[in-house]
C-alpha cells in the first residue's frame, strides 16, 4: 500500500480559509506569518517561499525577513525578539539549520513559543518532552515539531497501530528524529532510535515493524534493512545522483517487500505543510 499524504493534507487544509476569515473578522486584521529567509541555504529558502505562498492562498499575510552571513548574532536576536512581541505577527518560521555563526540555543530561547509554529523553541521542546502520553501532547501549550506531527497524523489517518509496535527511527536530529521518537513513545510504540553510530544498523532496523527514516541521505535505506511486511515512512528530502528529488529510501526496491510505504514527493511533505498552516490558524484562534 502506498501511504500518500495529499488526501490527508487536503482534508486538513479544507476549512483553514474559513477559520482564517473568522480570525480576520474578530481580530480586525488578517493573520500574519513572518519567515526568516536565509538564501545561502537554497533548499530552506525555496521551502519558505512555498510556505509563504500557501499561507497567502489560505488568507494569511506572508512576510520574509532576509538574513545573510553578515547578519550578526545580535541583529538576529533582535529580529526574533521583535517578532516575538509584535502583536500583529501570529506565526514565525526560522530556518533550520541556522547559520553557524549564530548562537542557536539563544535564538530558540528568544522565540515566543506561541508563535513558534514549527515547535523548535526551547520552551516548546521542553513542554513536549515533559509529556508522558498522547493526551498530554494534544493538550500542551505551544506547538510540537510539524514534521514529526505530520508523521503521526499520517499513521493515524491510515489507522496504523502503534501501541506496542516495535518502531525504528533512523536519525536523531532535534528537528525530527528525537521529537518524533518521543511522540511515538507517547503513542505507546516501542521505539528504537538508530543513527550513524548504531552497531549492526541493518540488523537493528530489520527487526522493526515500522521503519521511519529522517537522515537526509538519498536512497540510504535499502531492502536488506527492512523486513518483509514492514511499514516504511520516508521523511527525507534529497536529490539523487541525477538531481532527481527523492527520499532516504530506495523506494522502487523497498516497496516490493513492504506492506506500506510513503512516497517522496507526495508522502509526509504535504502533510507537514498542512500542519504548519493549521498551526498559524491555531495561533490566531488562541487570541480570540
Swiss-Prot record:
Stretches that traverse the bilayer: none
Biological or metabolic pathway of the protein: One-carbon metabolism; tetrahydrofolate interconversion
MF terms in GO: methenyltetrahydrofolate cyclohydrolase activity; methylenetetrahydrofolate dehydrogenase (NADP+) activity
Keywords per UniProt: Amino-acid biosynthesis, Histidine biosynthesis, Hydrolase, Methionine biosynthesis, Multifunctional enzyme, NADP, One-carbon metabolism, Oxidoreductase, Purine biosynthesis
Biological processes per GO annotation: L-histidine biosynthetic process; methionine biosynthetic process; purine nucleotide biosynthetic process; tetrahydrofolate interconversion
Annotated catalysed reactions: (6R)-5,10-methylene-5,6,7,8-tetrahydrofolate + NADP(+) = (6R)-5,10-methenyltetrahydrofolate + NADPH; (6R)-5,10-methenyltetrahydrofolate + H2O = (6R)-10-formyltetrahydrofolate + H(+)
Keyword Transport assigned: no
GO cellular component: cytosol
Protein name, as recorded: Bifunctional protein FolD
Assembly information from the UniProt record: Homodimer.
Entry binding sites for NADP(+): 171-173, 196, 237
The protein's role, per its UniProt record: Catalyzes the oxidation of 5,10-methylenetetrahydrofolate to 5,10-methenyltetrahydrofolate and then the hydrolysis of 5,10-methenyltetrahydrofolate to 10-formyltetrahydrofolate.
Family listed: Belongs to the tetrahydrofolate dehydrogenase/cyclohydrolase family.
Organism: Elusimicrobium minutum (strain Pei191)
Gene name of this polypeptide: folD
Domain of life: Bacteria
EC numbers, comma separated: 1.5.1.5, 3.5.4.9
UniProt-listed PANTHER family: C-1-TETRAHYDROFOLATE SYNTHASE, CYTOPLASMIC (PTHR48099:SF5), C-1-TETRAHYDROFOLATE SYNTHASE, CYTOPLASMIC-RELATED (PTHR48099)
Pfam families: THF_DHG_CYH, THF_DHG_CYH_C
Keyword Ribosomal protein set for record: no
Amino acid at each position: 500500500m502506498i501511504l500518500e499524504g495529499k488526501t490527508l493534507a487536503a482534508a486538513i487544509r479544507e476549512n483553514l480559509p474559513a477559520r482564517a476569515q473568522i480570525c480576520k473578522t474578530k481580530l480586525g486584521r488578517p493573520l500574519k506569518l513572518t519567515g526568516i529567509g536565509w538564501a545561502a541555504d537554497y533548499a530552506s529558502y525555496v521551502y519558505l517561499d512555498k510556505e509563504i505562498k500557501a499561507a497567502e492562498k489560505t488568507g494569511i499575510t506572508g512576510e520574509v525577513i532576509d538574513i545573510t552571513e553578515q547578519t550578526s548574532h545580535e541583529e538576529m536576536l533582535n529580529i526574533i525578539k521583535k517578532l516575538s512581541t509584535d502583536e500583529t505577527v501570529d506565526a514565525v518560521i526560522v530556518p533550520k539549520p541556522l547559520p553557524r555563526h549564530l548562537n542557536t540555543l539563544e535564538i530558540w530561547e528568544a522565540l515566543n513559543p506561541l508563535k513558534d509554529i514549527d515547535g523548535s523553541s526551547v520552551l516548546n521542546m521542553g513542554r513536549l518532552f515533559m509529556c508522558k502520553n498522547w493526551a498530554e501532547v494534544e493538550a500542551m501549550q505551544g506547538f510540537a515539531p510539524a514534521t514529526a506531527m505530520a508523521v503521526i497524523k499520517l499513521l493515524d489517518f491510515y489507522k496504523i497501530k502503534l501501541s506496542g509496535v516495535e518502531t525504528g527511527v533512523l536519525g536523531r536530529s532535534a528537528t525530527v528524529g528525537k521529537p518524533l521518537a518521543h511522540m511515538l513513545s507517547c503513542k505507546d510504540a516501542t521505539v528504537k532510535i538508530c543513527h550513524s553510530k548504531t552497531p549492526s544498523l541493518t540488523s537493528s532496523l530489520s527487526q522493526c515493524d515500522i521503519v521511519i527514516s529522517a537522515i537526509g541521505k538519498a536512497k540510504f535505506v535499502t531492502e536488506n534493512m527492512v523486513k518483509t511486511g514492514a511499514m516504511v515512512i520516508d521523511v527525507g528530502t534529497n536529490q539523487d545522483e541525477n538531481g532527481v528529488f527523492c527520499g532516504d529510501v530506495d523506494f522502487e526496491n523497498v516497496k516490493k517487500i513492504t506492506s506500506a510505504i510513503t512516497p517522496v514527493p507526495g508522502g509526509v511533505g504535504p502533510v507537514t505543510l498542512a500542519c504548519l498552516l493549521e498551526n498559524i490558524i491555531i495561533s490566531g484562534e488562541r487570541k480570540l
